[in-house]
Amino acid sequence: MAKVPDMFEDLKNCYSENEEDSSSIDHLFLNQKSFYDVSYGPLHESCMDQSVSLSISEISKTSKLSFKQSMVVVSTNGKVLKKRRLSLSQSIADDNLEAIANDSEEEIIKPRSAPFSFLSNMTYHIIRIIKHESILNDTLNQTIIRANDQYLTAAAIHNLDEAVKFDMGAYTSSKDDTKVPVILRISKTQLYVSAQDEDQPVLLKEMPEIPKTTTGGETNSLSSWETRGTKNYFISVAHPNLFIATKHDNWVCLAKGLPSITDFQILENQA
């Protein structure tokens, strides 16, 4: 009499064979050397369902991306927690990677021109004149005086009547309330200090009245006024990395720092 095949026995044998093959494959992967030559310990039970990303020390110090690529952070169950698109040919260093991994929101990395785009959309409104007929001295005890009808310079003087007296008007910004935008006007005139480029002399620009509203594209006459103790700094709104500065035997200009002098003492009108 023919023996009826035991289907359950065949399934059992098949399962055993697959289990052996799976064990062999797992063993092969476990013993295979990583492409990045990095070993990882077992995932602790308390780390389940949490964000997983490579340690910064396990990544080359500076990675160069020559193509568009996304960085994705996933949980242990495969759920995408956040991702970020990296721009074409962007250089990504340790700090960038760490910031991306710790960022709680998805966002596109903005180009370096983003701050300038932000500034160009800002609007400034005059509040009031906050200083009248004040004198500006630099740390070399030089006083700002008129060089000619168009430019200013700094010199050591004995008679303060030679000094330029400034009125200072304060503005408020539509988007940034952390700074104090101001405009400098030569007292009893319609001449306003107007910035150009780095190492270029500031101009005395004539306007019929103090601008009530100034937009981001017309900010050459505005400076962010900062004080540190008795020192005063005027940072160009049009060029946020440049200060109004004095330079030995030269005109008042825009500069980043030494050898130009960027800090001033304001002598208030005592009248």
Swiss-Prot record:
Main location: nucleus
Keyword Cell wall biogenesis/degradation: no
SUPFAM superfamilies: Cytokine (SSF50353)
Maturation propeptide residues: 1-112
Recorded GO CC terms: cytosol; extracellular space; nucleus
Chain intervals for the UniProt region annotation (Nuclear localization signal (NLS)): 82-86
InterPro entries linked to this entry: IL-1_alpha (IPR003295), IL-1_CS (IPR020877), IL-1_fam (IPR000975), IL-1_propep (IPR003502), IL1/FGF (IPR008996)
Superkingdom of the organism of origin: Eukaryota
Phosphoserine: modified positions: S87
Location in or out of the cell: Nucleus; Cytoplasm; Secreted
PTM sites of type N6-acetyllysine: K82
Disulfide bonds: none
Domain note: The similarity among the IL-1 precursors suggests that the amino ends of these proteins serve some as yet undefined function.
Oligomeric and partner information: Monomer. Interacts with TMED10; the interaction mediates the translocation from the cytoplasm into the ERGIC (endoplasmic reticulum-Golgi intermediate compartment) and thereby secretion. Interacts with IL1R1. Interacts with S100A13; this interaction is the first step in the export of IL1A, followed by direct translocation of this complex across the plasma membrane.
Protein function: Cytokine constitutively present intracellularly in nearly all resting non-hematopoietic cells that plays an important role in inflammation and bridges the innate and adaptive immune systems. After binding to its receptor IL1R1 together with its accessory protein IL1RAP, forms the high affinity interleukin-1 receptor complex. Signaling involves the recruitment of adapter molecules such as MYD88, IRAK1 or IRAK4. In turn, mediates the activation of NF-kappa-B and the three MAPK pathways p38, p42/p44 and JNK pathways.
Protein's recorded name: Interleukin-1 alpha
Organism: Cercocebus atys (Sooty mangabey)
Phylogenetic lineage: Eukaryota, Metazoa, Chordata, Craniata, Vertebrata
